Regions:
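Basic, polyanion-binding surface patches
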Residues: 1-137
Length: 137
């Protein structure tokens, strides 16, 4: 699945929040598992994002099978060339209207070896976010 809301909460312990619609088929799976992995997508992952979000008409099982997932250090599905991978435990769940807010304590972080553009979803469209390159003076 893809989510449109991920935010940092705390740096000690490293915690982020993820918002997920309670009607999502993934909701009971994530909550029941108690763990999740956040794959931060690169600009070239728009097709992957569309597929995992269900925008292509494929069934959930087919969507997952189409991506070359690896098993991360914490046992969750990881996109091998993601910009960053955050694996962690759901330590708190709060209901807020149509969504659950899942607080995830990060147990493992993996960063890509090279810098690339990021991918964001805004205004019902995907957008590439240019990677900034720091130039030495």
């Amino acid at each position: 699945m893809t989510v449109s809301a991920v935010s940092s909460v705390s740096d000690d312990p490293a915690t982020v929040l993820v918002c997920i619609n309670v009607k999502s088929a993934a909701h009971p799976i994530l909550v029941g598992n108690g763990r999740l992995c956040i794959n931060i997508l690169a600009g070239h992952h728009e097709d992957v994002a569309r597929m995992i979000a269900g925008m292509t008409g494929l069934a959930a099982e087919e969507r997952m099978a189409q991506v070359g997932w690896e098993t991360g250090d914490y046992g969750q599905p990881v996109l091998p060339d993601a910009l960053a991978v955050l694996e962690g435990d759901i330590v708190l769940q709060q209901q807020a209207g149509t969504h659950s807010v899942l607080f995830v304590e990060i147990r493992h972080i993996r960063l890509a070896a090279s810098q690339a553009d990021g991918l964001a979803y805004f205004g019902r469209r995907f957008h590439r976010i240019a990677a900034e390159v720091a130039l030495a003076a």
